[in-house]
Regions:
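Active-site PLP-lysine loop of aminotransferase-like
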Residues: 122
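Surface-exposed amphipathic alpha-helical tracts and adjacent flexible/coil segments at the periphery
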Residues: 1-21, 26-36, 51-52, 58-68, ...
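Aromatic- and glycine-enriched glycan-recognition loops and surfaces
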Residues: 40-49
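Basic, amphipathic alpha-helical recognition segments used for DNA target recognition
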Residues: 103
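Alpha-helix capping/helix-boundary segments
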Residues: 99-100
């Protein structure tokens, strides 16, 4: 049985380093054009080459996203972009546009094609169509259950196509790749890399007949929670998923490091016994790490057939973090917090007050005789009162510190000395993304 590949996002070089150090098997990233996250920092061909060299040396693959709808006049430039990405060392290209995928398969047959979730592959016909286009992998639509994924994985195996599934991160309210809300409301097309996040805006619910507002569970009526499949990794492994994808090219290196590290540890427990799949769940600390990295509230959503209010985040459309306790008292600009978990200087806390939410960074920290944390409130948090809930939206201890030399690669060196001949030095290392021995010699 082949282990699930852990596929991590990278919107910049720091996030790439974080993904590799946290244990990703592969990283997906975008160039400056033709990708669905044009708001990320993204990569140039030059920095893509650097990314490929860094990752391949450490046994990690790089997939480049060309995952938007391409206009007729852009096909030539898109093909050239694909060609340059492949020459730079990309291991695969992730494509949304059917026409572009067909053209790449025709003009550049050596390139490995992966079908984006934006192509909305949700049935056997879609899998077989991808195989006819020459694709080697399909990222399935996110609206599928584990049972449906298992069926499509079997269809894919018969057609010679792997299946990839999203396992963690933001969900869309519309079908994968079929959303026109951003275009209609914000004048920015999600299928052109410019999603305006219209589903995260506040809305009112009205009775169309009587033209009056109705009561609603919150303002953000179209905002889903975040997908979290960390409790289902054994099920996804048995279903035949080849790659588990983490969303987040617009998110920070801290997020990438935290989320990838948790999924890496749990997946390793799933495959603890070689050749079999073991039940594995996250620890409470691991679950908290995911919440603090970014959370609108978590759901398994369609993976377990959930389609109702349970998958929605009506109250807020952004990061809520992890609950850590309540304010015991607040006076003279000092908040005393009965915290259930240890706080640290540099943490970002959010107080849920009767008048809204107030966030601040912990710049000083002391403790009273009862061991309760005491922090000085800044101007934004002056409305904090006793009883208010406190959430941590960024953990200083989980912050990622970039170092492009990490993780270091173990090498073996040998020196050869012979009288009358030049000194010869050789270095070799066994781990590359292709699993081959690499050796360098010089005199």
């Amino acid at each position: 049985m082949r282990n699930i590949e852990l596929l991590a996002p990278a919107g910049n070089m720091s996030a790439l380093h974080a993904a590799v150090r946290a244990g990703a098997d592969a990283v997906y990233l975008g160039l400056e054009s033709f990708n669905a996250r044009r708001g990320a920092d993204n990569f140039t061909i030059v920095t893509l080459k650097e990314a490929c060299d860094y990752a391949h040396l450490r046994g990690v693959k790089i997939y480049v996203t060309l995952n938007i709808i391409v206009l007729p006049g852009e096909v030539g430039r898109a093909l050239e972009c694909a060609r340059q990405a492949w020459r730079a060392g990309a291991d695969a290209l992730i494509i949304q546009d059917i026409g572009l995928a067909s053209e790449i398969a025709r003009a550049l047959p050596d390139i490995r094609l992966h079908i984006s979730t934006q192509m909305n592959t949700c049935n056997a016909a879609g899998i077989r169509a991808a195989a006819r286009m020459g694709a080697k992998r399909v990222t399935l639509a996110r609206e599928l259950s584990v049972e449906e994924i298992a069926h499509l994985a079997q269809v894919g195996a018969e057609a010679g196509v792997e299946v990839e599934a999203f396992g963690h991160g933001a969900l869309c309210i519309c079908y994968s790749g079929q959303c026109l809300m951003s275009s209609m409301i914000g004048g920015r097309s999600a299928n052109r890399g410019l999603c305006a996040q219209a589903c995260r805006l506040p809305y009112e619910l009205h009775n169309a007949a009587q033209r009056n507002p109705l009561s609603a569970p919150g303002e953000h009526l179209l905002s889903p929670k975040d997908l979290c499949s960390v409790d289902l990794l054994s099920d996804l492994a048995r279903a035949g998923v080849a790659s588990l994808k983490i969303e987040g090219r617009m998110k920070s290196a801290d997020y990438v490091s935290a989320v990838v590290s948790v999924y890496r540890r749990v997946l390793d427990r799933v495959y603890a016994q070689e050749g079999s799949v073991s039940p594995a769940r996250p620890t409470e600390d691991e679950r908290r790490t995911l919440e603090e990295a970014f959370s609108r509230g978590f759901t398994t959503a369609y993976l377990e057939g959930q389609r109702g209010n349970d998958i929605m985040s009506y109250q807020r459309p952004n990061n809520r973090g992890a609950f850590i306790g309540r304010v015991a008292e607040a006076r003279n600009g000092i908040a005393t917090i009965s915290a259930e978990h240890e706080l640290a200087i540099g943490d970002v806390l959010e107080f849920w007050t009767g008048k809204g939410h107030a966030a601040q960074t912990v710049s000083d920290l002391s403790f009273d005789k009862k061991g309760r944390a005491r922090i000085e409130l800044d101007a934004r948090a002056k409305g904090v009162r006793a009883g208010d809930r406190v959430f941590r939206v960024r953990s200083a201890k989980e912050a990622f510190e970039d170092d492009s030399l990490e993780p270091r690669v173990e090498v073996e060196g040998a020196v050869r000395l012979r009288i009358g001949e030049p000194l010869e030095v050789s270095f070799s290392f066994a781990r590359t993304s292709q699993g081959e021995l690499a050796e360098v010699r010089g005199t």
